[in-house]
Amino acid sequence: MAKKVDGGMRAKRLTGDIVTYIILASMCVIWLMPFFWVIMQSFRDGVGQYISTFLPQAYTLNNYKALFTDFSVINFPRMFMNTFFVACCSCVISTFFVLAVSYSLSRVKWKMRKPYMNMAMVITLFPGFMSMVAVYFILKALGMTEGDKIYLSLIICYSSGAGVGFHVMKGYMDTIPKALDEAAMIDGCTRWQIFTKITLPLCKPMIVYQVITSFMGPWMDFVFAKVIAGAKSQYWTVSIGLFNMLEKEYVEVWFVRFCAGAVLVSIPIAVLYLLTQKMYQEAMSGAVKG
């Protein structure tokens, strides 16, 4: 009797596992299908938005080549470098801001600490684009919406609010025993040495997370870049360029190039994720061993 019960339980468990894996596989296919379609369309030989078949009839690399040779509508290489420069600068500044604010809130007791945390919590409840118009007119009054100052304006917009996004990093720093800081201070270490030699190495997983999010924000943003850069195409980012490819007068010819551009734009994020994932795994394995 016990064997029959065990056999029935195993059969139910096996059936449940099969159903679970089928559902997960179906969801994976549904999720990956649009990405696969865009990649295939980027190699399609021809023009137009729609074709009668899911896969292209003929393949070519001309769509990728056109992005770097045909500047009649957009200058894709320049937009790519504009975005890369702004995203890298914003990433470095934002990560530094978050680390500094998180450390001061986690380890240093000061008078306005709790009011600042409460204020930051309220501010993060509102989307950033609500301040877009005010930010634009402030930058315009300062003369920072013309010429190369547009780069600085974009970097300021993307990194200036990083100081209020400290919650995840601070929560992680709170888990680090303060006894480590006290022992280091007894040995004669300064606050800066404790921060750089002890806290930062232990925060590697969260630093990786912060780097990824700080880079992806400027890389994928459209609203602030469009408002600040305006019609000055030499300062456009890739999001504006890709959007411009889908304008009514260009979409028939540039749709397949749009797909090629979308593939190229995803490469830096994929590379960053792969590199930081390795660092994250190494940091976590080191923490477990420690």
What is each stretch, according to the model?
Residues R10-K12, G16-G290:
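A structural signal for multi-pass alpha-helical bundles of membrane permease subunits
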Residues M1-A11:
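Short, Lys/Arg-rich, polar N-terminal cytosolic tail immediately upstream
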